[in-house]
């Protein structure tokens, strides 16, 4: 069971065995989102104690956001509300959008999810469909807010799933290209070595989660998309 975590508010100045399913393959059902009820409730309780600012950058997604302990150091000057949850899937992002996304009225939403979906046998088409559902839900209340998809990463521990992960990234990248309010953050290419395989120096011993160097690289790729530090506006 993922451990609950209190809300992370950075206010320093922006105060998975392989599942090689093609797009048309038989599709699996996602795990029940209610397994994360305690995690989401913990964020809500923390918000009641200390409400995060609106108009910030919102991170929502899986453990790669949840475990970003050096976020304030890697992206100084930005107001970032981090709502990552360990083991979260894209399906979970959609399910909890009303509670983890909409209340914050962010100026930019960054989603990192999809890797856990692939690890449980979900197809690229299913992950794309869930991301599209998330975009539709956000657009109902915040029609102009930019939404960025942070690509599924090539962790060495999940390299056996590389084909489906690439397919997932490609499907979402193509969808994002159809809407100027959507952004694709390409982490995949930067995390590959000269041999075309994943760089081993960017990962913890589990070979799934980024180490400090991996997060530094992520921050460098994200920074141009985030805009100027402390650039805040209400969507």
Annotate each predicted stretch with a short phrase.
Residues 1-60, 65, 69-74, 227-235:
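N-terminal secretory targeting modules
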Residues 52-54, 76, 105, 143, ...:
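Residue-level preference for short coil/turn positions at secondary-structure junctions
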Residues 57-61, 80-84, 108-112, 146-151, ...:
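Structural recognition of the beta-strand scaffold that forms the well-ordered cores
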Residues 65-81, 90-129, 148, 152-156:
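Oxyanion-hole/transition-state-stabilizing segment in secreted/luminal serine hydrolases
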Residues 154-235:
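Catalytic His-Asp segment of secreted/periplasmic serine-dependent ester chemistry enzymes
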